[in-house]
Amino acid sequence: MKINLHTIKIAEVVADYVDSDEKGVSGYGGKLNIRPAYQREFIYGEKERNAVIDTIFAGFPLNVMYWVKNADGTFEVLDGQQRTISLCSYHAGEFMHVIDGSLRGWANLTDVQKKKFLDYELQVYICEGTPDEILKWFRIINIAG
């Protein structure tokens, strides 16, 4: 299996974010399946979701994510689904968060705050391999972290 580290800005990940029963959950310009079939449908609670947003605005490193690159050039989230959904749903205005002492949704952020969020670089390992290799890697990273 081939695994390469990439830096991808949040702006790229949240592009064309969709979360619907019909179309599933996708982002990255429609090229990223955020909730593939092997992923659970668990969504972070408010505390965990807010910790993701705090991490971004504090400029701290967010845990690495793993994506699978498919033969057709699309991607699937192998690990990092809840973090990705938290970022996308905040950008979509689906919840508010305390930033700089004030409760703010995406629409209430200053241009500087929006730029900081969108320019944040995520560390993403992109994996290519057979379905068996990908499933084995999924099991390993979900046990070993």
Q: Which sequence ranges carry the predicted segments?
A:
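C-terminal active-site-capping segments
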Residues: V13-V25
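Basic- and aromatic-enriched surface patches that contact anionic nucleotides/nucleic acids
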Residues: I3-D16, P36-G145
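Membrane-targeting and insertion segments and their boundary/processing signals
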Residues: E22-G27, A107-D111
